[in-house]
Regions:
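C-terminal regulatory/oligomerization modules of transcriptional regulators
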Residues: 90-151
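N-terminal helix-turn-helix DNA-binding core of bacterial DNA-binding proteins
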Residues: 9-49
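Basic, amphipathic "hinge/linker" alpha-helix immediately C-terminal to the N-terminal HTH DNA-binding motif
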Residues: 19, 72-94
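A general structural signal marking secondary-structure boundaries and capping sites
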Residues: 34, 64, 99-103
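Canonical helix-turn-helix DNA-binding module
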Residues: 44-68
């Protein structure tokens, strides 16, 4: 699913792949929560509509970020990050830290400190878990209700 690029700018090309409202949240759920199924993504707490979720999963697969494989029961399709997808780990980490620094979030301070002080270890553990197909959640499910800086 190649689309015409606006320019040769790497940032523009990257945003063409994952610059919408939902794609990085789907990647986050796969990377740190171990989500693999459509149903798991629907219950993430973000409120994504089923048609949008299906579209984003299809686009992420077409872009080579996500791969599909039969689920353990063989009745459904499961999703897994590709090598290209796991390479987004540093991007997600920096976006999380930026958001925590500039917006009111529900992320525990201890977790943010760990991510800040031990960036390389956090990224190495993320990659190891992906390589080993370890699907246990890396971080606890956080309160995903909308929060505003002035609350």
């Amino acid at each position: 699913m190649k689309s015409k690029r606006r320019s040769g700018c790497p940032l523009s090309a990257s945003l063409d792949v994952f610059g919408d409202r939902w794609s990085l949240l789907i990647v986050r759920d796969m990377m740190v929560r171990g989500y693999r199924t459509f149903k798991e993504f629907r219950t993430s707490g973000e409120g994504i509509a089923t048609n949008i979720l299906a579209d984003r999963l299809e686009k992420l697969e077409a872009a080579g970020i996500v791969e599909t494989e039969p689920d353990s029961d063989g009745r459904r399709v499961g999703y897994r990050l590709s090598e290209k997808g796991i390479d987004l780990a540093p991007v997600l980490l920096e976006v999380v830290l930026w958001g925590a620094r500039h917006e009111k979030t529900s992320t525990p301070a201890a977790l943010l400190e760990q991510m800040t002080m031990n960036r390389e270890a956090f990224l190495a553990e993320t990659r190891r878990r992906w390589k080993d197909r370890d699907l246990t959640p890396m971080i606890p499910r956080l309160d995903m209700r909308r929060r505003h800086k002035n609350e």
